[in-house]
Amino acid sequence: MARVRKITTMAELQAALQAAFNAINRDFYGGELEKVIITVKEGKRKGAFGWIEVAKNWKQNGKDRHEINISADYIGERSVEETIITLMHEMVHLYNMQHEIKDTTRAGIYHNKNFKRTAEAHGLDVEQLSGIGWSR
């Protein structure tokens, strides 16, 4: 069994999340998703495990980039698997933004059937949850 090394710095955490993004993009999206900046910071919304910024707020090598954030409020409380599921969830939003597919309503809270279709087509199982729609 592979040995798992403990992550001890924010830089290591961000590098691990970026490596996960790259692997998921390759394996589930055929490398189609544009590069993003992954951040870890305190919650934008209470109860949100992560989010993607609609605006491209970052510049990297002269290119504008979206930001995917994993909420620092839950790091250490949630498993690695749950954190990767959050990353995959935000990647669904990225795919839909790139393809101009509206996947939420109610100020981005409710995840509609477009979100469900894209999620399931790219390896993320979702269920209908009260108040937020199709999510995980």
Predicted regions and their residues:
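Active-site recognition of the HExxH zinc-binding catalytic motif
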Residues: 85-98
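Short, compositionally biased low-complexity segments
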Residues: 1-2, 89
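Glycine-rich, basic loop-to-helix element that forms the pyrophosphate-binding segment
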Residues: 82
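Metalloprotease/metallohydrolase-associated module, dominated by Zn2+-dependent proteases
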Residues: 2-78, 98-136
